[in-house]
Every structure is written in structure tokens, then in C-alpha cells.
Amino acid sequence: SSEFKSKIVIGTWSLSGDYGSVDLSKIQEVLLYCYEKGLREFDTAPSYGNGFMEFCLGSVFGNKSDVLINSKIGNSPFYGKSFIIGDLKKSFECTLKRLKRDNINILFLHNPRTEIHDYDSIHQFMDELKRDGKINFKGISLAKGYDYSSIDLNRFDVVQDDANLLSMDYKKLILSEKTLFMARSPLASGLLSGNIAPNTVFEKNDHRSFWLKGDRLISLMKRVDKIRGQSNLLLPIIARKFLLEDTQINRIIFGIKKKEHV
């Protein structure tokens, strides 16, 4: 339904090559297909494919005003993590160049943990970008498993975090009505897709090959089987339905790698 459609943001990490290689023409085809289907909001980051994903979005959509692009700062291609204002500025300028635009929708801090000691100067920098019309909203993308209780998340317009049937910590976040919550990883890196088994082995260039294996994979699959047993719907449908119906969630990032995922 259109009410649900407006909740959907297309995630581009899985297209970028970090989940196994994808070629350029295929990426362009998938992005245009999303656009044709009325999906106009995309989530990306400079580190996805080392700038490659932003470059692809720029070459497909350029400055199109009916496309919303959300990106991140704090983790740059080849350079790694830094939340020093000068580095954030540089990173954001490179993002605009790659995207071929003068404005983006939401700019997120990319999974900061202990690196930021002074959020005030960061807010000042992001508020300036808002005033200059370079970004519409400022956000923070939360790192998995890190405790943000000492930070006032309500100073941000948008908070992004993992939210799925295997990651329910987002329920503990206390956000004001003015702060939107954006869910990511709805299928828990594929664990809720129905395509992973306890003996699955991932390609070497797929980031999951590092952490999703052995006992960890087996114990997660036990939890997945439990979820599967509670309904006769297909697993990914159970997972998506749960998020779409959760009123605490304002937007959901669905990652795609091919047209069939749309």
C-alpha cells in the first residue's frame, strides 16, 4: 500500500560489492527499476564499495529533485574512521561530488562509538549544513551493540539502528516525537531471508564470511527456526510485516542486490 511504500528506503550497501561482486550496468538497472516502481529514497555511505556506490547513484540520478539520497560521514573510503570536523567536511564535499548533487536529504554520523568527545561542535557543523541548504536533516546511525545512553539522541532529526526479529534493542530507545526512527537490517543480514542454513558458507568477499559462521551461525539459526515455527507465512514476509506494522518505526531500509528483491 502507499502508506507502507512511504516507509520504505532502498539500502545500497548490498549493491556496492561488499556482499560479493556486482557489475556497474546491473547496479544502474536495479536503481532505475526502483525509481520506476516509485521508490525514491536511497540510503548510502562513502564507505560502501569505497565511494563506488555514491558514484553509481550520482551517475544514475544526478541532481534529480524527486530522488532523496541519505548518506553518512565519519567513515571515508581508504581513510577509515574519523569524526574530526575537518575530515567530516572533506568527506561530505566528496560525497556531494560523487553524487553530483548540491543537497542530500539526511546526513548521518556513521556508527560513532568512543570517537566523539564533543557532540556540540558536531551539531554546530551539521546545523550549518542545514542552514546552507546542503542537507535537509541531521541523523546518527548507531553502531551495533554500543551503549548510547549517555548521548542525547533527540538532538538529531533521525536515528538509524538495527531493527528486526533478532535485534529488538531499538525498543529501548526513547525518542521524542520530533525524532524519526529509521530501521536497518530488516532481514538481519539475510538470516531472516529463508536462504541461510546452519552450514551456509559465504563468498570470501562477502562481509558475512568473517562473522557469520560456526557456533554463532548455528545458535542464530535456532532462533530463526523458532520464529519460523510461529507462523505459516514465509520467513521474510513475517520479518517485513513485523517492521511495517510497528508504529515506533518511521522508515525501513530494505537492502537490495537484484531486481527480484524489489
Predicted regions and their residues:
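N-terminal binding-site loop/beta-alpha segment at the start of enzyme catalytic domains
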Residues: 1-68
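Acidic (Asp/Glu)-rich catalytic clusters
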Residues: 2-5, 36, 58-68, 96-102, ...
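Conserved, mostly hydrophobic/aromatic
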Residues: 10, 34, 42, 57, ...
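Active-site mouth loops of central-metabolism enzymes
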Residues: 13-25, 73-89, 115
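Short, acidic/polar
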Residues: 21-34, 83-100, 142-150, 239
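A short, structured active-site edge motif that brings together acidic residues
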Residues: 66-79, 107
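Active-site groove signature of glycoside hydrolases
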Residues: 96-117
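Beta/alpha (TIM)-barrel catalytic core signal, keyed to glycine-rich beta->alpha loops juxtaposed to Asp/Glu
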Residues: 112-261
